[in-house]
């Protein structure tokens, strides 16, 4: 006599499963759409957190990243120029202040970066299944 296992119906994850964050024990490498949804969630979170990004206007992912970089540099400058920090950490001789690149300069490189962006997904995939934004 042979043992038979019951046949399970194969069901694709519905959009509601993704929006609820329900995972069917797949890693991002196994499910590229899940990785895409997670990345889009991360971009949405960044858009909410950075005050210089207009909330009522659609912005590209590249623009979001540019605003994030600008915001981080602004915060670094604010920290570096705070009187308490300045008195604690005197600038070493020969060490220059980091200069900030304006967004307009970064926008000129978008075409180059967008051509290279097609290579990123395969390079960034890892076996790490942690969700970075959430």
UniProtKB/Swiss-Prot annotation:
The keyword Transcription regulation applies. One of its GO terms (biological process) is astrocyte differentiation. InterPro entries: bHLH_dom, DNA-bd_prot-inh, HLH_DNA-bd_sf. A motif (Nuclear export signal) lies at residues 106-115. Residues 23-75 form the bHLH domain. Phosphorylated in vitro by CDK1, PKA and PKC. PROSITE patterns: BHLH. GO terms for cellular component: chromatin; cytoplasm; cytosol; euchromatin; nucleus; protein-containing complex. One of its GO terms (molecular function) is transcription corepressor activity. It comes from the Eukaryota. Gene3D superfamilies: Helix-loop-helix DNA-binding domain. Keywords: Biological rhythms, Cytoplasm, Developmental protein, Nucleus, Phosphoprotein, Repressor, Transcription, Transcription regulation, Ubl conjugation. It is found in: Cytoplasm; Nucleus. The modification Phosphoserine is found at residues 14, 25. Interacts with GATA4 and NKX2-5. Interacts with NR0B2. Interacts with CLOCK and BMAL1. Interacts with IFI204. Interacts with NEDD9/HEF1. Interacts with ASB4; this interaction promotes ID2 proteasomal degradation. Transcriptional regulator (lacking a basic DNA binding domain) which negatively regulates the basic helix-loop-helix (bHLH) transcription factors by forming heterodimers and inhibiting their DNA binding and transcriptional activity. Implicated in regulating a variety of cellular processes, including cellular growth, senescence, differentiation, apoptosis, angiogenesis, and neoplastic transformation. Inhibits skeletal muscle and cardiac myocyte differentiation. Regulates the circadian clock by repressing the transcriptional activator activity of the CLOCK-BMAL1 heterodimer. The bHLH domain is essential for its repressor activity towards the CLOCK-BMAL1 heterodimer. This is DNA-binding protein inhibitor ID-2. It comes from Rattus norvegicus (Rat).
């Amino acid at each position: 006599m042979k043992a038979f296992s019951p046949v399970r119906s194969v069901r694709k994850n519905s959009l509601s499963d993704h929006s609820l964050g329900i995972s069917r024990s797949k890693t991002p490498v196994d499910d590229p759409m899940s990785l895409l949804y997670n990345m889009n969630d991360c971009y949405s979170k960044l858009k909410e957190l950075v005050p210089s990004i207009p909330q009522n206007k659609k912005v590209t992912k590249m623009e979001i990243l540019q605003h994030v970089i600008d915001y981080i540099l602004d915060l670094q400058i604010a920290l570096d120029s705070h009187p308490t920090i300045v008195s604690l950490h005197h600038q070493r001789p020969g060490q220059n202040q980091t200069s900030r690149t304006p967004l307009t300069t970064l926008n000129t490189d978008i075409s180059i970066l967008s051509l290279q962006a097609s290579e990123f997904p395969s390079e960034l995939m890892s076996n790490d299944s942690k969700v970075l934004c959430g």
